[in-house]
């Protein structure tokens, strides 16, 4: 029996045990994991260093290396996320709705775990912690399949989680890692519908598209982040500068960083040159349309591919438009339905933008960088869904549950 199948069978078995665990037992396990991560930080960082060194030898980009990198502060952030998760209400067993029928039947809709969750993701070892802990909180078993680039980090983190779970009432096999990082193991995971209840891909567009295309298991799609900010003609200059710089340069390798700014031509004529200079001072390479190049001749002329690209680096596309409607059309044409923002003092244009733009998260006068489970108050998230069925946006605890109906009677039969 190969690794993927064996772990699928074990996960199905463990899921039946997890559904019986109380909130207190699950929280004790989460607390143990947080403590163990701190206790074994040096070990995790040493294994992460191996991934970084191998990545550099393979010529990985700076943005990929950043996604791969763990630091003491990033591990502390992980544990803080776990502590927030402990404080959140456990949705399992929650009554979503209840009513009584004229025949006396009492019907309740109750939240229950999904069962076994498969998680396939790239580079980021922090996802290993996020996925494991949020699945445990919601009573789900999880099978993790990271990329070869992070294999040492992922193996170390899962080993630490297992050592923590050994001290609790939850089975160690509640969290399992597929150590085979070949394409064959991924392909088998895609098709394990007898053992997986849902598969969640988290990574670049190519990975997500492959999973959606090839999986026979139900997929919760976490889309790529080709995010935009539209600066309307009434936008406050300093606010716009602060938001754009934050949304692009704070951490360009993440999915909620912006990839294109759309400028109203009147605003661009007044402030565009200064904004472009400010971005270039921070190492941003600009690629713009003809109107943007006319304002700053050092800007590279954008191609069709640039509008479609999630750069995940200090590269930013620039589009200049005449109206809010033109901005909305561009965003709906090229956006990935992740996070989109408008900076304006015109409430009518805010209303148009919020009504017409199709995305999981829409912002007025704020950075797109807030599309995140922690920032939304969800605690650790398992991903940001860009699809419309089941759940959309940052996927917190309720996203990893389903419902079942519990009907109580006193002898009723159907006539």
From Swiss-Prot:
- List GO BP terms, alphabetically: L-proline biosynthetic process
**Annotated Gene Ontology cellular component terms:** cytoplasm
Which UniProt keywords are given for this protein, alphabetically ordered?
Amino-acid biosynthesis, Cytoplasm, NADP, Oxidoreductase, Proline biosynthesis
What are the EC numbers? Answer: 1.2.1.41
Catalytic activity as recorded in UniProt: L-glutamate 5-semialdehyde + phosphate + NADP(+) = L-glutamyl 5-phosphate + NADPH + H(+)
Which CDD domains does the entry mention? ALDH_F18-19_ProA-GPR (cd07079)
Lineage, top-rank taxon, reads Bacteria
Molecular function terms in GO for this entry? glutamate-5-semialdehyde dehydrogenase activity; NADP binding
PROSITE patterns assigned to the protein according to its UniProt record, in alphabetical order: PROA
The Swiss-Prot or TrEMBL record describes its family as follows:
Belongs to the gamma-glutamyl phosphate reductase family.
- State what protein this is by name: Gamma-glutamyl phosphate reductase
Specify the species.
Answer: Bacillus cereus (strain B4264)
